[in-house]
Amino acid sequence: AEYDVSDADIEAFYQXXTMTW
């Protein structure tokens, strides 16, 4: 991922549809 978070966090971000950072 090109964000400063793990791929698992990115996956959760897309699934949950809300920003977590």
Curated annotation (Swiss-Prot):
Possible mediator for cell division in the blooming process. One of its GO terms (biological process) is cell division. It comes from the Eukaryota. On the 2D-gel the determined pI of this protein is: 5.8, its MW is: 21.5 kDa. It comes from Prorocentrum triestinum (Red tide alga). This is Preblooming protein 2. Keywords: Cell cycle, Cell division.
